[in-house]
């Protein structure tokens, strides 16, 4: 049981040495000196060092001892209770002590980029609502608009961003004909979507009815017309046909 623990401990030691060497924490000269120390130790497991096994089914046992807690320098890890530690592993407990004074650097954290906020008057942005024809700024009267309502010298002049252009470039007008901006203006303000207009044909028909009272009266249903029609069908001796006729 002790030999198995020693073998596992040696394997961990070699793995740790390889990791330290690969990470650049120890030099190749230091690595060679440690390996030479392990090879020169008469109690080392040569089968593990050379990758060969001198026994057919068993590993060569190594010397092991129980480590006295007082022998371990302060600040180094202590072995667990009743845990046999190999002499080689105990000799390597001081490995990396020269690095113990280095300050541990916290992992670098990546801050999320803040979303662009509305520019202030310090940037001399002219109000896009005031600048765009046919629009008025609702916040200017309340004194809440952060933009200039004047042609400030050196101010950024851009109209509102076209709603349809911002929505996947769906504007049917060219950049020259559209009164809104077909580019990401610095103020980042997009024009609202136009409201649906009522049909001109519907408005014109209603206006025509109002201008012709007789025509409007004819379009309205009068119950007296039904009574007159019933009298005509009775005089002809036939019933009035159904509505689906």
Curated annotation (Swiss-Prot):
Extent of Basic and acidic residues compositional bias: 209-226
Entry keyword Disulfide bond: no
Region of interest called Disordered, as start-end residue ranges on this chain: 186-245
Zinc fingers (C3H1-type), renumbered ranges: 121-152, 161-185
Alphabetical UniProt keywords: Metal-binding, Repeat, Zinc, Zinc-finger
Gene Ontology molecular function terms on file: zinc ion binding
Function as written in the Swiss-Prot or TrEMBL entry: Part of the gene cluster that mediates the biosynthesis of the brasilane terpene glycosides brasilane D and E. The biosynthesis starts with the activity of the terpene cyclase braA that converts farnesyl pyrophosphate into the sesquiterpene alcohol trichobrasilenol. Subsequently, trichobrasilenol is glycosylated by the O-glycosyltransferase braB putatively using UDP-GlcNAc as sugar donor to yield brasilane A. The latter then undergoes two rounds of oxidation performed by the cytochrome P450 monooxygenase braC.
Protein name in the entry: Brasilane terpene glycosides biosynthesis cluster protein D
Organism: Annulohypoxylon truncatum (Hypoxylon truncatum)
Name of the encoding gene: braD
């Amino acid at each position: 049981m002790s030999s198995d623990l020693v073998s596992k401990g040696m394997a961990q030691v070699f793995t740790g040495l390889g990791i330290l060497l690969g990470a650049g924490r120890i030099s190749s000269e230091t690595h060679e000196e440690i390996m030479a120390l392990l090879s020169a130790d008469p109690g080392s497991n040569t089968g593990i060092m050379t990758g060969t096994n001198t026994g057919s089914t068993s590993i060569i046992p190594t010397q092991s001892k129980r480590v006295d807690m007082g022998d371990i320098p302060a600040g180094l890890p202590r072995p667990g209770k009743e845990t046999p530690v190999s002499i080689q592993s105990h000799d390597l407990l001081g490995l990396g002590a020269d690095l113990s004074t280095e300050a541990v650097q916290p992992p670098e954290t990546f801050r999320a980029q803040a979303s662009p906020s509305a520019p202030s008057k310090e940037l001399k942005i002219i109000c896009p609502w005031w600048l765009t024809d046919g629009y008025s700024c609702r916040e200017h009267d309340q004194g809440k608009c952060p933009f200039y309502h004047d042609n400030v010298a050196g101010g950024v002049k851009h109209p509102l961003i076209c709603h349809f252009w911002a929505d996947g470039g769906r504007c049917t007008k060219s950049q020259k004909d559209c009164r809104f901006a077909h580019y990401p203006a610095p103020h980042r303000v997009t024009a609202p979507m136009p409201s649906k207009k009522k049909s001109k044909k519907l408005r014109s028909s209603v206006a025509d009815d109002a201008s012709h009272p007789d025509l409007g009266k004819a379009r309205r249903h009068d119950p007296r017309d039904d009574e007159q029609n019933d009298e005509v069908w009775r005089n002809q001796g036939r019933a009035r046909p159904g509505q689906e006729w």
